[in-house]
Amino acid sequence: MSLQILEKHRAVWQRKKILQDIYLYWYKQIRAQCVDLGPTLEIGGGGGNFKESFPEAISSDYTLCPWLDLNLDAHLLPFRSESLGNIVVLDVLHHLNRPLYFIEAAQRVLKKGGRLIMLEPCIT
C-alpha cells in the first residue's frame, strides 16, 4: 500500500466517528489480552490508529510512514529471538504473501508465554 493511500485512510478515520468507536472497542479488547512480558509490536500499523490507543506499542508497516515507529517486512521480523511480549496483527494476515513465514517469524521473536493476537475481517 502506498503512503498516499494510507494518508487517505487516516483522513477517513478522522471523519467517521462510528468507525472509530468500533475499532476502539476492539483495541481495548486486544490490549486486555496483552501480557506484560516485554514490548508489544503492531504489524501493519497503516494509518496509525492502534498506536493512538496504545502509544507504548511499537507500530510498524511495510510502507514507510512518518507516524509509525518502524518500516519492516512481517515475514522477516528484525528482532532478537524471544524479545517481544506481544505481537498484534489487526486486519493484516490476509494481505501477507506468505502467512506461514510470518507465523514462524512471530514464534521466533515472542518470549515464552508471549502472545500473537490477530483479528481478521470476515464477510460472509
Residue ranges with predicted function:
Residues 38, 81-83, 114:
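Surface-exposed loop/turn positions
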Residues 76, 94, 123:
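Active-site micro-motifs of SAM-dependent methyltransferase domains
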Residues 75-87:
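A short acidic, Gly/Pro-enriched loop at the edge of an enzyme's catalytic core
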Residues 100-115:
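A short glycine-rich, Lys/Arg-flanked "PGG" loop and its adjoining helix->strand segment in the class I
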Residues 1-76, 103:
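Conserved N-terminal segment of class I S-adenosyl-L-methionine
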Residues 117-124:
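Conserved class I S-adenosyl-L-methionine
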Residues 35, 97, 111:
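Short conserved AdoMet
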Residues 86-92, 118:
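A short beta-strand submotif of the Rossmann-like class I SAM-dependent methyltransferase core
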